[in-house]
């Protein structure tokens, strides 16, 4: 059984993230979506909220599990007995950072591979940052996120006002 981990902050989970999950879940026996607590980032949604959102969006995939994690990715990968780390590449600008991370992960986890997936054409430009900015400014994000995510955004923005 081949287990893969797809880590990210997923702040919020977008249609692009779901696209990668759908495709990766067809490749691997089990896919663990690791929702990261990153002390270097100031997420819009709390870790618990991001886990809840991801579970709502991805709950219909029988071989996908959503878990939160903090600390080193290598420890999360080991805990889940994963053989592959899945990463998305939207643009050439993502490549340099992801290439360096893959090299470091290979050093820390020599028996684990990193697999890059590019998004489907209609999702190449979507990012959580763009979605949040559009939503905060009152724009329509329905083409970029699922209805449940849009509701989470509206509720969070409403509380902030």
Curated annotation (Swiss-Prot):
Pathway: Cofactor biosynthesis; coenzyme A biosynthesis; CoA from (R)-pantothenate: step 4/5. ATP binds at residues 9-10, 17, 88-90, 98, 123-129. Its main location: cytoplasm. The gene is coaD. Its cofactor is Mg(2+). Reversibly transfers an adenylyl group from ATP to 4'-phosphopantetheine, yielding dephospho-CoA (dPCoA) and pyrophosphate. This is Phosphopantetheine adenylyltransferase. It is an enzyme of class 2 (transferase). GO terms for biological process: coenzyme A biosynthetic process. InterPro entries: Cyt_trans-like, PPAT, Rossmann-like_a/b/a_fold. Its EC number is 2.7.7.3. Gene3D superfamilies: HUPs. HAMAP family: PPAT_bact. It comes from Cupriavidus metallidurans (strain ATCC 43123 / DSM 2839 / NBRC 102507 / CH34) (Ralstonia metallidurans).
